[in-house]
Amino acid sequence: MSDKDDTETPVVTKATPSPEDGNCEPARNSESADQSTKPESKSEPVASTRKRPEARSSHDLDTADIHPVQESQALGKDPFSKEVAQTGWGYWGSWGKSLLSSASATVATVGQGISNVIEKAENSLGIPSPVEISTQVQYASGDTNTKGNESTSPVAGPFGVFSTISTAVQSTGKSVISGGLDALEFIGKKTMDVIAEGDPGFRKTKGLINRNSTLSQVLREAKEKEELRTTNEVTMETDRKTHYGLLFDEFQGLSHLEALEMLSRESEIKVKSILNSLSGEELDTLKLDLEQLKETFSLEEFCDEEEEEKKGDEDFTKEIMELFSQLHISCRPEKLTRARNAAYEWIETPLKKPLVEKEEEEKYLEIQSTEQVNKKSVECLFFQDIHAFAIRSLAELTAYSIELFHKTAALVLHGQKQEVTAIERSRALSQMTVVLCKDLSIMSKEFTTCLTSAGVKEKADVLNPLITAVFLEASNSASYIQDAFQLLLPVLEISLIESKTQLPQA
Amino acid sequence: MEAIWLYQFRLIVIGDSTVGKSCLIRRFTEGRFAQVSDPTVGVDFFSRLVEIEPGKRIKLQIWDTAGQERFRSITRAYYRNSVGGLLLFDITNRRSFQNVHEWLEETKVHVQPYQIVFVLVGHKCDLDTQRQVTRHEAEKLAAAYGMKYIETSARDAINVEKAFTDLTRDIYELVKRGEITIQEGWEGVKSGFVPNVVHSSEEVVKSERRCLC
């Protein structure tokens, strides 16, 4: 809350806390949040909101495919071919579809430098399967018919809050651009695919380009672009405070992601060469085992879970600790749980005692800018703080989650002899992914509720972009975590193979 | 958090297990000393800005590596993209000093075709009574490899700042003189963003980089 003072209007008004200021208490229900955000939904361009960096393959579009496993079997006979790697995982519904397919596609690239993209010779890249094309078409035609399609889409995912929000999507030429609440809309369903090109050919091109970059590259580029942009502008300080990518990097999320990608890539190469060296029955059994392992990475739990209540700090900590202990690795998730609980504490503070909080804020401001305080700026600062804190927390928790996955990968590969099977580990990790993502979605709701009540006096066009940004980044966070989780698959495959080959010897 | 920096240097910190690599870095980046710390798993990441001249900041990305042998295959991967390194040994542990040249050999193999500017760090100098390595022999060894030598203590915050900033300054000089250049595909040095000050000719983007170990 030590923000820079942004008072532009030097109106000399004494900042007395009036009763109307205590508007933080009632609006805990998302209903009011919806009300206040609805009106402007169409026209408002979301200035501070950045779309998730694109590195999506055309696979992302196949949100309609319900049985990817079967489909993948139909597509590629060889369960270890690219096709399967890319389509096999994505079941658990229509939200949070992520960079995964491109991430896992890229880990196969041999000797690819972190930011040094080498052309790949894989000719399968960028060419969508007939199934994808048909789903793309479906998708494209669905877009024009917004209401009918969208509202029936399952929004039972972690971001189910949006099921109550009616959405509007405008179709402008070849891009489908949705405004205002658009971000909310696609979080519920298609996550980052909202700005989908109606032109499949264009998508195809884009897919081709993007297949060659890993998630961390995309994020790094986005971050660097942002750094460049912010240095060129005067608004740097406040901008940086709310820029997810920069914050994510500050918490070393990018570095851990790169490190994880590296381990994943190496493992994948190893797996391939092992499979190439095997034949006959040996190969068939191993393939079967690996197939089983892969199934644990499908994150199906996302589908059938209902909207969950917010967990208490202890519950979350306990659950994560428990899952982590099931991995039998010498590392603990305290950094994450501590940060998570601290974030919740922060959220609850202003909600419980809004007046106190506000008075402090005003006092602080009075000191800061002597007389130049008006009531409006006080409120303004307050909800902007919430926004900044929300983005920061999301970036922090995501970075720590990815750090955990990175450490897990390192320990699975180079840890002590394992007492648990790779499948057991994958199950625990998969559950952990679900828990983390759900918690983030719940947290983002808490943040926006908080934001809505703090900024209830604000115009929707001031508040909405901030709310949208929080939801958007929460969705991105969840996607990153899932992507990172998927990067663990080759690592666990190696672990599985090693345990199989070690057993007879022992 | 200050956004503006002239360059970003990647530094790697290596040395035997338990010589205090993580503690040294934490003292430098977080300003405190952790009494107990778990052994590093694989590699860890830290960063800090250093002001080498008034208004001239360098962002340091510091790679903390596990000393344990079993993670060697992971940590090796990080040599290549480092411009500088701190090679630590524990002055109360003779073995860790004897291993210094093995560490240098190890890096030499894996850093090709690049070079790392190393500084030799005798750590835990607060435990002088338990010293097993004299300053003289450490200096001799460092000189033989063309390194500087410095003794530090993370616990008592002795020379921690100096160890990092001296190394940073040395690298900066080499960059300024064009002996280290920013290269495509190499992450050791990256150009940052300069405030509205004159950028001068320091920004060298040649494709050649000379040896300086």
From Swiss-Prot, chain B:
Keyword annotations: Autism spectrum disorder, Autophagy, Cell membrane, Cytoplasmic vesicle, Disease variant, Golgi apparatus, GTP-binding, Hydrolase, Intellectual disability, Lipoprotein, Lysosome, Magnesium, Membrane, Metal-binding, Methylation, Nucleotide-binding, Parkinson disease, Phosphoprotein, Prenylation, Protein transport, Transport
Tissue: Highly expressed in the brain.
Region span, Switch-I: 35-43
Cofactor or coenzyme needed: Mg(2+)
Enzyme class per UniProt: hydrolase
UniProt GO molecular function: GTP binding; GTPase activity; myosin V binding
Cleaved signal peptide residues: none
Residues that hold Mg(2+) according to the record: 22, 40, 64
Activity control mechanisms: Regulated by guanine nucleotide exchange factors (GEFs) including C9orf72-SMCR8 complex, which promote the exchange of bound GDP for free GTP. Regulated by GTPase activating proteins (GAPs) which increase the GTP hydrolysis activity. Inhibited by GDP dissociation inhibitors (GDIs).
Membrane topology reported for the UniProt record: Lipid-anchor
Pathological association: Intellectual developmental disorder, X-linked 72: A disorder characterized by significantly below average general intellectual functioning associated with impairments in adaptive behavior and manifested during the developmental period. Intellectual deficiency is the only primary symptom of non-syndromic X-linked forms, while syndromic forms present with associated physical, neurological and/or psychiatric manifestations. XLID72 patients can manifest autism spectrum disorder, seizures and macrocephaly as additional features.
Domain notes: Switch I, switch II and the interswitch regions are characteristic of Rab GTPases and mediate the interactions with Rab downstream effectors. The switch regions undergo conformational changes upon nucleotide binding which drive interaction with specific sets of effector proteins, with most effectors only binding to GTP-bound Rab.
Protein name: Ras-related protein Rab-39B
